[in-house]
Amino acid sequence: MLFLAVFCGFLAEYQLEHVIENQREKQFMRSMVEDLEKDIAGLETESKLVKTQYDKLDSLTEMIYEGDLSQFQVTKMYELQRRYLYPLTLKLINRTELQLTNSGGMRLIRNKQVADSIIYYWGITELLYDTKNNINVHRDRAKDISFIIFNNKYYKHTEGFSLGFSLDPSKGEPALMTRNPAVLSEFANRISHMSDLLKRNYKQGRVDHQARNAKRLIQLIKKEYHLE
């Protein structure tokens, strides 16, 4: 009888732990879905911004390659390089990933298909960051050359952050610091390469692909864990 009582107590404790683990697992999956929904919003916004960015950078390179730099084109070049030659800063949500790491890792997710899909998603996120960082290196090199071509004195200097980057009329019509064909061509070549990377490697190959991954993963989690 004593053995039976001990066994029943052990069984009840085991069942309680099992229920608690199930609840924790399901809570992690709810948290993961919330993260993914935020990721989708961020990725879709990034996709639109990046398309505008590489379209405008393509316009800038076309002006340089055409070679007929009128005052109108020079003014437009000042606007485009300042407004669209910016670094990529996308950061996806890693809240649930950190929580799982601090709680014992993926062993808490006992559904193998879901666990494998989450690990795959996180792996693609790291590849996305690698691509982003690589493009930012090319951007930095192009930006270094821009300091030889464009004179910042023609821009309005305002306190705090501004998306306007307006030209200052009091400084007169903006002029290029150099019209050296080799310098301008290198600048255009670097921007053209950056634009191609933005279009194919980053937007199509990473951002749009990861948005689709996030949507599929949400569907899988909701199906396997019976979430609304």
Walk through the language-model features, giving the residues of each:
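Hydrophobic membrane-insertion alpha-helices, especially the h-region
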Residues: M1-L11
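Long, hydrophobic alpha-helical segments that serve as membrane-spanning/inserting helices
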Residues: L11-E228
